């Protein structure tokens, strides 16, 4: 049973790689497959605002990265155009509000790293015209713009092209995402940024010492920009052993205590559901596992979006005030997007 408070919430998730699963199908099937496979899960979880990252797997890099980037952006547009009674692709805060008022799920496009753009900073305006409103500049490893998570030993910040990319994103109104950026790169961005940034799917390094998580100093610095940190549900980033639901709640509470309750959101990263949907499972072969990460692991009950009411319930049981739970479940992200996207 869904809690009344969960039904009141503008449940928002800053990271669901469902585009990978949908775009793996022939384009004629995109709208129908989303409606059949993913829409019921989003509705069951009460999701009202969903960020759709465009992630390009190694199979497409480097030669096919731009084509796959455009293909996945097109996939998001086809999903929205083919399901006008259920979802709407939004590029401004006003459009998000209109979608919510119409009872639709608001979708926002993001780029998770930019392998398709490489160092061509001028192409950032192109993807902005296509609807991208959030972007990061690195994933695992090194890019022409910055070193990603796991490359902290290099001590490298943003390259000159990376600095130009940050400036161009701020000019255009694209939100800079620091998730997956190396530690020195995060510090560099926070030094240069003149507008609020976000971490779309990162948890607390104080609780799980993993390079994908943020230190308390980084959490406070993101909050100081006016930004938001969206907690990642992925099991390997929550605990060194098998992650539990309580581990996840600990990360929410820790980030709220360090960054402030107005700077916490959800960036669930339901990897397992995406992996199970992929046909063929090209993204599961070697890539994630070679980095010591099991893409099929998950927190019990949170295999996919349908489990999100459990988070509302869990936060309430931890003693958080209802208003604070509503902020975490999506109120903060909704406010942040309205402020940043206009």
Please tell me what each predicted stretch does.
Residues 1-154, 209-342:
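N-terminal hydrophobic targeting/anchoring segments and the immediately downstream early-domain regions
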Residues 115-118, 129-212:
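Divalent metal-binding pocket/active-site signature
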């Amino acid at each position: 049973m869904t809690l009344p408070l969960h039904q009141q919430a503008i449940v928002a998730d800053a990271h669901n790689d469902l585009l990978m699963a949908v775009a793996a199908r022939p384009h004629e099937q995109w709208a129908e497959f989303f409606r059949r496979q993913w829409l019921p899960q989003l509705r069951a979880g009460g999701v009202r605002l969903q960020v759709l990252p465009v992630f390009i797997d190694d199979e497409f890099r480097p030669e096919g990265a731009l084509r796959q980037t455009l293909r996945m952006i097109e996939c998001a547009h086809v999903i929205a155009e083919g399901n006008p009674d259920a979802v709407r692709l939004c590029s401004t805060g006003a459009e998000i509000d209109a979608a919510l008022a119409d009872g639709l799920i608001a979708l926002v496009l993001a780029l998770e790293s930019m392998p398709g753009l490489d160092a061509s900073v001028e192409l950032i305006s192109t993807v902005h015209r296509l609807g991208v409103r959030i972007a990061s500049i690195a994933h695992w490893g090194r890019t022409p713009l910055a070193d990603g998570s796991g490359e902290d030993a290099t001590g490298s910040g943003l390259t000159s092209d990376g600095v130009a990319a940050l400036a161009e994103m701020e000019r255009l109104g694209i939100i800079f995402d620091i998730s997956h950026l190396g530690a020195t790169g995060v510090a560099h961005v926070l030094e240069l940024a003149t507008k609020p940034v976000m971490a779309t799917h990162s948890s607390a390094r104080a609780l799980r010492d993993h390079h994908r998580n943020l230190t308390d100093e980084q959490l406070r610095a993101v909050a100081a920009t006016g930004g938001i940190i969206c907690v990642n549900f992925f099991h390997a980033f929550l605990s060194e052993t098998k992650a539990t639901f309580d581990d996840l709640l600990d990360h929410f509470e820790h980030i709220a205590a360090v960054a402030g309750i107005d700077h916490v959101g959800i960036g669930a990263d339901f990897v397992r559901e995406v992996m199970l949907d992929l046909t063929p499972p090209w993204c599961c072969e070697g890539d994630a596992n070679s980095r010591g990460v099991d893409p099929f692991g998950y927190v019990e009950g949170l295999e996919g979006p349908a489990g999100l009411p459990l988070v509302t319930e869990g936060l309430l049981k931890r003693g958080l005030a209802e208003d604070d739970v509503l902020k975490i479940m999506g109120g903060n992200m909704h406010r942040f997007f309205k402020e940043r996207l206009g």
